[in-house]
Structures are given as C-alpha cells and as structure tokens.
Swiss-Prot record:
<dbReference type="GO" id="GO:0008199">
    <property type="term" value="F:ferric iron binding"/>
</dbReference>
<dbReference type="InterPro" id="IPR036524">
    <property type="entry name" value="Frataxin/CyaY_sf"/>
</dbReference>
<keyword id="KW-0408">Iron</keyword>
<keyword id="KW-0479">Metal-binding</keyword>
<dbReference type="InterPro" id="IPR002908">
    <property type="entry name" value="Frataxin/CyaY"/>
</dbReference>
<comment type="function">
    <text>Involved in iron-sulfur (Fe-S) cluster assembly. May act as a regulator of Fe-S biogenesis.</text>
</comment>
<dbReference type="GO" id="GO:0008198">
    <property type="term" value="F:ferrous iron binding"/>
</dbReference>
<dbReference type="Pfam" id="PF01491">
    <property type="entry name" value="Frataxin_Cyay"/>
</dbReference>
<protein>
    <recommendedName>
        <fullName>Iron-sulfur cluster assembly protein CyaY</fullName>
    </recommendedName>
</protein>
<dbReference type="InterPro" id="IPR047584">
    <property type="entry name" value="CyaY"/>
</dbReference>
<dbReference type="GO" id="GO:0016226">
    <property type="term" value="P:iron-sulfur cluster assembly"/>
</dbReference>
<comment type="similarity">
    <text>Belongs to the frataxin family.</text>
</comment>
<dbReference type="InterPro" id="IPR020895">
    <property type="entry name" value="Frataxin_CS"/>
</dbReference>
<dbReference type="GO" id="GO:0005829">
    <property type="term" value="C:cytosol"/>
</dbReference>
Length: 106
C-alpha cells in the first residue's frame, strides 16, 4: 500500500466512526472531533479515546484508558499487531467501558 492509499483508507475509517456515532442513540454523550488527522472521542466522565494514523508505518493507532494498540490492514480489516483483535472490537470494548453503557460501531 502506498501513502495515498493509506490516507484514503484511514479517511474512510474516520468517516465511518463519525457516521456511526451520529446515528448512535445511547444515553451517554460522546463527542467526536477530528483535528490534523487525529480523531478524539470525548466522554461525559472526561475520559478520551485518541485515534491517529502513523503514515510511515501505514498503521492506525488507538489510545484508550486500557492501553495503546497498533493496527495493520489485513485484507479488509484493521488488526492489532499484538493481539490479533480487530479495530472495531477493541474500539467498542474501550468506548463501552468509558461511556458506562454498550457502544456499538457496527
């Protein structure tokens, strides 16, 4: 994958997260902000989830209260380079914990 393809895929991921949060009807308020290629989810309790892109590595990084994760594209899925879990699984787990209620991005 070249840099422009990586940015196209990362932009699509950011857009999907935004759209799914816009359609989410949970009780908690989750704010989504994109600034300089970094996507920040802010929760009512003051906690945050930070998602950014690492262009030189063609990775997406996810920072949560539980820890940091690095994802490589494998086929059509962003997969954690340590655990093998998908981006969506880890994002949902972290968002659910930080929101205090079930959050789904699917």
């Amino acid at each position: 994958m070249n840099d422009s393809e990586f940015h196209r895929l990362a932009d699509a991921l950011w857009l999907t997260i935004e759209e799914r949060l816009d359609n989410w009807d949970g009780d908690s308020d989750i704010d989504c902000e994109i600034n300089g290629g970094v996507l920040t989810l802010s929760f009512e309790n003051g906690s945050k989830i930070i998602i950014n892109r690492q262009e030189p590595l063609h990775q997406v990084w996810l920072a949560t209260k539980q820890g940091g994760y690095h994802f490589d594209l494998k086929g059509d899925e962003w997969v954690c380079d340590r655990s093998g879990e998908t981006f969506w699984d880890l994002l949902e787990q972290a968002a659910t914990q930080q929101a205090g209620e079930k959050v789904s991005f699917r």
